[in-house]
C-alpha cells in the first residue's frame, strides 16, 4: 500500500488583505505531480457561546447579516481578533457585550470548520451555564446596535433548526450538540436541573475543558496581522 500523498505547496501569492479576511492563491502539488491552484480565504477564527439557563432555555440574538440581506437568529459570537487573547476570554467578553450575561461554568461544546473547501475558518462553540444577567454595556456599533436578544426553550430552538428558521451554521451545530449533551445520562441534571429533553445519547465525559486542544484553529491571518494566537 502506497503512503498517503503529501499535498505540498510549491508557491503562494497573496491577492487581498482586509480587516476580517485575506485571500491567497496556493500552488498545490497533486498526486501524479501536477500542480494546480487553490484559492484560500484566511480567517482569524471565531468563538460562539451557547448560554444555557437552569430551565433549559437558551439566549440567542436576532442580527442583520449583510451578505444575506436579512436578520437571522444566532448565538452570541465574536472574532478571535484581539492579539494574545485566548478563546474563552473572548467568549466571556462577547457574552457580556452581546446579551448581557456572566456565566459560572464553561466547557467546550463543539468545534467546527465552516467551509473547508476554500477557507481555513474554524469555530469553537462554548457551553456557558450558571448564568447571571448583568445587562449589556451601553453603546454598540453598526449591526450590533440593532441586534435583539431573545430567550427561548432549547427544544423550541431545535425545532427552529429542523424547520429551517435557524440556519446559522455554528448555531445549528451548537444547539444540536447541546440537545445531545442534555440527553446524556447523568449530565443533564448536573447542568440544568431535573428536566431532560430526550433519550440518552452521550455521557458527561464528552464535554471538554475550555483549554482543550484545538488543532484546526487558524493562525495564518493572525500571523499576517502580527498577532500570533496564544
Model-assigned labels for residue ranges:
Residues 23-27, 50, 60, 125-127, ...:
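Conserved hydrophobic/aromatic beta-strand scaffold that supports enzyme active sites
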Residues 26, 56, 95, 153:
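Terminal peptide-recognition signature
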Residues 2-6, 48-93, 135, 141-144, ...:
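Conserved Nudix-box catalytic region and its N-terminal flanking loop in Nudix hydrolases
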Residues 83, 87, 91, 114-118, ...:
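Short, well-structured alpha-helical patches and their helix-loop capping segments
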Residues 22, 44, 52-53, 65-67, ...:
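Active-site segment of metal-dependent pyrophosphate-handling enzymes
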Residues 11-48, 54:
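Acidic, metal-coordinating catalytic segment for phosphate/diphosphate chemistry
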Residues 2-7, 34, 108, 116-119, ...:
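Nudix hydrolase/Nudix homology domain
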